[in-house]
């Protein structure tokens, strides 16, 4: 558990840590995940600190979903995919946030319950190169502007 003074996402929302922002509103910001599942993987993060998604006030939850819905067609266009996935985890950082992921493969977002062979070893996704993040952010912002 963390508080807003040390929370990574709170610090990003306050502008203390740089990010590749693609959209923002009074309640939330959207920026690229630096360890993306796929290029264009966006995090939608409330500006206010909430440890769990079920703690979100209704207006904040609505805004997070509104931004995710706004991003989906922009990601389909800018990343050249047919489907965009949306999920909440709250596993790595104790600050409620949504993942909006351009899906290249149906298994880009899955559950271990569907895995036929075990054991599996999981580790963090590799850091995306800064240039790739900059290019993706520019493409997504462009697609948002064209919407």
Go through the PLM ranges and name each one.
Residues 1-147:
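HIT superfamily nucleotide-processing domains
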């Amino acid at each position: 558990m963390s508080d807003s003074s040390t929370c990574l996402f709170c610090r990003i929302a306050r502008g203390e840590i740089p990010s590749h922002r693609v959209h923002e509103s009074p309640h939330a910001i959207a920026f690229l995940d630096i360890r993306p599942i796929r290029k264009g993987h966006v995090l939608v993060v409330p500006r206010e600190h909430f440890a769990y998604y079920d703690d979100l006030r209704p207006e904040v939850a609505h805004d997070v979903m509104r931004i995710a819905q706004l991003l989906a067609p922009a990601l389909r266009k800018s990343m050249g995919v047919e489907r965009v996935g949306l999920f909440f985890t709250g596993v790595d950082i104790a600050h409620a946030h949504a993942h909006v992921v351009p899906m290249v493969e149906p298994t880009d977002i899955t559950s271990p319950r569907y895995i036929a062979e075990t054991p599996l070893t999981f580790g963090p996704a590799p850091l995306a190169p800064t240039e790739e993040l900059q290019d993706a952010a520019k493409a997504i912002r462009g697609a948002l502007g064209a919407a």
